Design a protein with these regions (language model features):
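Mid/C-terminal beta-alpha module of Rossmann-like enzyme folds, strongest
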Residues: 41, 51-104, 131-135, 139-141
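Glycine/proline-rich active-site loop of Rossmann-fold NAD(P)-dependent oxidoreductases
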Residues: 4-23, 57-67
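Conserved C-terminal active-site "lid" loop/helix of NAD(P)H-dependent oxidoreductases
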Residues: 100-119
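Substrate-positioning beta->alpha
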Residues: 18-25, 36-56
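Conserved sequence/active-site signature of Rossmann-fold short-chain dehydrogenase/reductase
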Residues: 2-4, 50
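An acidic site on a long C-lobe helix of protein kinase domains
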Residues: 46-50, 75, 123
């Protein structure tokens, strides 16, 4: 999921900000849209880091083929726990974590090609912190 502060809007129209797309999905989570974890994982990347990957690949004459642009994948237990830590008003069920015997391992990716582009990326927790701050600045949280 590509998330991060949007470029649309201005300081003059913060009251009209309505999160959409993947930021809308993250906003929905922070507003309590999911109160329990599913046995699945999600991959994240900051929008600015993703854009930097695109530019670096375009500018690199040796770049060809497919490049993944993502930080890593986290299980929903970790995603919701981190969002709750960063945004305490988040409402989750008391036993929100998935605790089945069949708990999955988050999807793993080889980052060698992505890292060859030389772009330093933010971690998921930092991405979430910036998104929450952005929503708060816009009055959406």
């Amino acid at each position: 999921m590509i998330v991060g502060p949007g470029v649309a809007g201005s300081k003059d129209d913060d009251s009209n900000y309505t999160p959409s797309g993947t930021m809308g999905r993250l906003h929905w989570l922070l507003k309590g849209g999911r109160s329990k974890s599913s046995n699945d994982s999600m991959s994240y990347i900051d929008v600015q880091d993703c854009a930097a990957h695109h530019i670096a690949a375009m500018e690199n004459p040796n770049a060809s083929g497919r490049y993944f642009s993502l930080v890593e994948s986290w299980h929903w237990n970790d995603i919701l726990s981190t969002l709750k830590e960063l945004y305490p008003p988040l409402q989750l069920d008391a036993n929100f974590k998935y605790e089945g015997e069949d708990i999955i391992r988050p999807t793993q990716f080889n980052h060698d090609r992505m890292n060859s582009l030389g772009v330093n990326v933010k971690g998921i927790k930092e991405i979430f912190e910036e998104c929450i701050s952005f929503f708060q600045d816009k009055g959406a949280l």
